[in-house]
């Protein structure tokens, strides 16, 4: 079992703390089934794959995938990036990734990818079309009446700022799917043609069966399957990871 990155440097008053959803993503990516799928998919002598995590939070998932790239993807020349609307989370992710890479690399063997940066952005708005080969998304999936505004604006207090930043990490609006639907709408344009693959976390109230059925109707022959399942309640809701991809 590969070690999980340390996030002891992160202030969880204003950054999403790793929980069951984070660890389910880590377990899924490093599972023998997915490691084999990803290694086979990126085994060709092609350009270096680009890895992007959208909504990095503490950086525990991206740090894990970056530091153990050779074991997960079968190659080290992965270019790893992240985005988050929370500038504090962006800084935390960069530190998590750098620290984890340094800890995982041994003098005689290195498993880590090439660390790029974390960019403060709304989902994939800063990414050029067709550039992402592996996308990871742990969205704000909790059903809520409203979505918090993306703009940080002016805060009356530090508590108000922290509450707003944390709300951005969990509040998903109607059926918990408003932010996820925006990301799904972008996927066919953002992922690299025929090579791109996405891992998206959903909870039962997001209606994953309906989500997968909708993806399968996308033009271009898209697939969507559950590849990771907590198998029990994750906090207050059952969680699963769906893989989204096209045949090469």
At which residue positions do the language-model features occur?
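S-adenosyl-L-methionine
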Residues: 91-130
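Short alpha-helix
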Residues: 180-184, 205-216
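SAM-dependent Rossmann-like transferase core, predominantly class I methyltransferases
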Residues: 1-73, 83-92, 125-128, 226-248
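Conserved beta-strand signature within the Rossmann-like core of class I S-adenosyl-L-methionine
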Residues: 195-201
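Short beta-strand element of Class I
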Residues: 78-81
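Mobile active-site "lid"/loop adjacent to the S-adenosyl-L-methionine
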Residues: 136-179
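Local beta-strand N-terminus motif with an aromatic residue
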Residues: 48, 131-132, 195
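A short glycine-rich, Lys/Arg-flanked "PGG" loop and its adjoining helix->strand segment in the class I
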Residues: 156, 160, 181-194
């Amino acid at each position: 079992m590969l070690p999980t990155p340390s996030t002891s440097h992160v202030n969880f008053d204003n950054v999403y703390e790793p929980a069951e959803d984070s660890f389910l993503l880590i377990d899924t990516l490093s599972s023998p089934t997915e490691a084999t799928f990803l290694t086979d998919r990126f085994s060709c002598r092609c350009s270096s794959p680009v890895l992007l995590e959208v909504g990095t939070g503490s950086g525990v998932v991206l740090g894990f995938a970056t530091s153990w790239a050779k074991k997960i993807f079968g190659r080290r020349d992965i270019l790893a990036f992240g985005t988050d609307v929370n500038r504090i989370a962006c800084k935390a992710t960069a530190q998590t990734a750098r620290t984890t890479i340094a800890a995982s690399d041994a003098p005689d063997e290195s498993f880590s990818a090439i660390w790029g940066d974390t960019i403060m952005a709304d989902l994939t708005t800063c990414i050029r079309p067709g550039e992402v080969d592996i996308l990871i998304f742990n969205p704000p999936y909790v059903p809520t009446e409203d979505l918090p505004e993306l703009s940080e604006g002016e805060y009356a207090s530090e508590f108000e700022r922290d509450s707003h930043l944390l709300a951005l990490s969990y509040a998903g609006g109607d059926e918990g799917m408003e932010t996820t639907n925006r990301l799904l709408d972008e996927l066919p344009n953002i992922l690299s043609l025929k090579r791109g693959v996405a891992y998206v976390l959903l909870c039962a109230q997001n209606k994953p069966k309906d989500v997968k059925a909708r993806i399968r109707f996308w033009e271009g022959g898209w697939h969507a399957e559950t590849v990771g399942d907590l198998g029990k309640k994750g906090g207050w809701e059952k969680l699963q990871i769906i893989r989204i991809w096209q045949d090469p």
